[in-house]
Amino acid sequence: VKDGNGFWRSCGKEVVLEQKVPCRVFYKKSWADVELGRKLLPNQDEEIVQFSENINGSGLVVVVIMKKNTATCPAIVICLGGPIAPMPDFLDQSSIYYHFIKQGFALIIPLRRGVSGIGKEWERALEGHYGEYDVEDTIAATDFVMLHHSDVIDTKNVFLYGGSYGGYVVGLIAGKANSNKRFKAIVSHCGVYDIAIYPWHCQGIPEETMKAYGNTTDKSVYSERVKDISPKTFVSNWNVPILFIHHLNDTTTWVGQSVAAYNDALKLRKDVALLIVHGPHTYDIPQKKSVFLEIVAFFETCKLNTI
């Protein structure tokens, strides 16, 4: 159903979509390096505090950003894009991260293996382990913050958001690492759902994509190897509300990936919704603000009453 904002919004029925032209383009924006350590991180917004901590000496760092002088607040764990990716400027006032903070959410940002700017070894550690180390690092960072910072984080209201590659990771976490419902709701934004067919849902050379995720160029071997890192394999385990958002003109991951996720979950009577909006694989679309508001509204409706 198309609404007044120009969004195609799911209405509890299966969605049928025709694939026309598969293509792929990568989104780049301005990025900023962040000094890491057990200390406050500098920022120019006096209403916001951000700090980072090393987790158990493993090399994993988590960044926490929130409004100053607030009581315990709900949190959104951010799965960054990539898979190999620099850190965005989380305090860029036009960013989705800044929007979340201003809406009263704390951000928990695991600088998982694959994030650049920490060291070459850390940056390359994810290669050959997509869908494995990124999931492990996200869970480890989340549990660390929930355990050590429950004085400022409302641990009963922790949510999960990921865009692009991060959208793929959150879908995997939904089925493989959320049996305890640590995440009360999840948003996958332009993510991959079925890794087995993803090589043909992007403009990249299929053999290169198969090599990256399955270390093979044989279709049958690839399909078998990626089963354990494909969100589709674990859809029956989804146990919290999930919102899929996808841009109709996305050329990195075909919109049909999110449509398939929604349809499969719907058949299993999962609590799932789908929102499709015009635009390519970037946050910078005409309806950016409306999309951000939709995500926040979704998380707000999923909050548990902790009074």
Segments predicted by a language model, with ranges:
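Serine-hydrolase catalytic core recognition
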Residues: 4, 9-307
